[in-house]
């Protein structure tokens, strides 16, 4: 599954780039080409809502009925670098709260539990613009700064040492999504919805991958 997703991601990015390059020039005569206007470049800072969960591998598929999303926030900055009329590159850096919850009587902890990770994440996205819509795809890396696990109202810190029961500092993932830009009272409103798929196991002793859905809303002057 991971290899399939990686192949789809790479193919998608190559398609976005090749499509945008082909659209970035316009022929007006056999020997003259005129470069079309590129997408605008800008920086914006954000505080966004995020819903996160954990995937425990195919061997623990029975946990699906016990999983609950953990709500969190992301705080950071995004830079859109306009390359052509239909294409831009978007690196971002933000602080993010990840993790997931399990209901009581689950096969792993038996009690209701919440696992939280506090991380810095750096995605680099290829963005295709089609009218007021845009589509994102790209890789991301993250560094897990701190983590906690709450079981039956008892909270403990996660260990990031290379030991049984420990967790990993670094992880890699892929992000895909889409958005829409519209005007409200002379203000430009930018809505972006994104799915974040962890590709690397964050646990030293079991299968555990981060999954999240990120909703971003940005308002700027026209």
Residue ranges of model-derived segments:
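Outer-envelope beta-barrel architecture signal
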Residues: 37-45, 85-89, 131-135, 170, ...
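Outer-membrane beta-barrel proteins
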Residues: 27-34, 53, 80-85, 130-132, ...
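Flexible, solvent-exposed loop segments that connect beta-strands
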Residues: 54-67, 97-118, 145-168, 203-205, ...
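Short glycine/proline- and aromatic-enriched beta-strand/turn motifs that initiate or cap beta-hairpins
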Residues: 21-79
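Residues that define the transmembrane beta-barrel architecture of outer-membrane proteins
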Residues: 39-43, 69-73, 116-120, 168-174, ...
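Residues on the lipid-exposed face of transmembrane beta-strands in outer-membrane beta-barrel proteins
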Residues: 45-49, 73-83, 93-95, 122-130, ...
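Predominantly the C-terminal beta-signal and adjacent terminal strand-loop region
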Residues: 160-165, 171-174, 179-222
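Cleavable N-terminal export/targeting peptides
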Residues: 1-39, 222
């Amino acid at each position: 599954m991971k290899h399939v997703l990686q192949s789809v991601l790479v193919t998608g990015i190559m398609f976005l780039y090749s499509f945008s390059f082909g659209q970035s020039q316009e022929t007006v005569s056999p020997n003259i080409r005129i470069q079309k206007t590129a997408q605008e470049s800008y920086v914006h800072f954000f505080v966004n809502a995020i819903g996160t969960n954990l995937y425990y591998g195919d061997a623990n598929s029975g946990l699906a009925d016990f999983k609950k999303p953990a709500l969190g926030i992301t705080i950071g900055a995004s830079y859109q670098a306009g390359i052509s009329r239909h294409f831009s590159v978007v690196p971002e850096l933000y602080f993010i709260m990840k993790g997931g919850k399990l209901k009581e009587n689950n096969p792993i902890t038996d009690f209701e539990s919440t696992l939280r990770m506090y991380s810095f994440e750096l995605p680099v996205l290829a963005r295709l613009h089609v009218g007021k819509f845009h589509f994102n795809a790209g890789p991301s890396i993250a560094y897990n700064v701190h983590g906690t696990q709450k079981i039956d109202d008892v909270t403990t810190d996660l260990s990031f040492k290379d030991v049984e029961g420990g967790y990993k500092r670094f992880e890699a993932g892929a992000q895909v999504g889409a958005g829409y830009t519209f005007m409200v009272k002379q203000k430009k409103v930018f809505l972006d919805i994104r799915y974040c798929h962890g590709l690397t196991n964050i646990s030293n002793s079991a299968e555990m991958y981060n999954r999240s859905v990120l909703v971003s809303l940005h308002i700027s002057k026209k």
